[in-house]
Amino acid sequence: MATINQLVRKPRVDVKKKSNVPALESCPQRRGVCTRVYTTTPKKPNSAMRKVARVRLTNGFEVTSYIGGEGHNLQEHSVVLIRGGRVKDLPGVRYHTVRGSLDTSGVNDRKQGRSKYGTKKPKDKK
């Protein structure tokens, strides 16, 4: 343990926490334009074709963003909203696109967990 004299000479320094989503610059979401929409494969042991988009943000950053849900309408030059949140089995993907905002449509025929996929409440058929 340090003596009081040592602490007077050289005080304790707080460890700065590094952000997991630096491109957001402390904002909850950011707007951007898709520069490329493509599919990629996850790390072992998983197997799929994951839908991702390369997005140029309004602050100049270019990031890779995951497109969640079944089916999407994104193409090059689509304007999207991205939020933080990584995809564990896709290296380098630290952001998610927000479904149901700007040019991104919500997921069709979704009944549960709709708020996460930008889907409106279905009309009751009686």
Swiss-Prot record:
UniProt keywords, alphabetically: Methylation, Ribonucleoprotein, Ribosomal protein, RNA-binding, rRNA-binding, tRNA-binding
Region Disordered, residue ranges: 99-126
Modified residues (3-methylthioaspartic acid): D89
GO MF term list: rRNA binding; structural constituent of ribosome; tRNA binding
Ranges annotated as spanning the membrane: none
S-S bonds: none
Extent of Basic residues compositional bias: 113-126
An example Gene Ontology biological process: translation
Superkingdom, natural source: Bacteria
Database matches in SUPFAM superfamilies: Nucleic acid-binding proteins (SSF50249)
One GO term describing the cellular component: small ribosomal subunit
Pfam family for this entry, one: Ribosom_S12_S23
PROSITE patterns, A to Z: RIBOSOMAL_S12
Record family assignment: Belongs to the universal ribosomal protein uS12 family.
Assembly description: Part of the 30S ribosomal subunit. Contacts proteins S8 and S17. May interact with IF1 in the 30S initiation complex.
Function per UniProt: With S4 and S5 plays an important role in translational accuracy.
Protein name, UniProt field: Small ribosomal subunit protein uS12
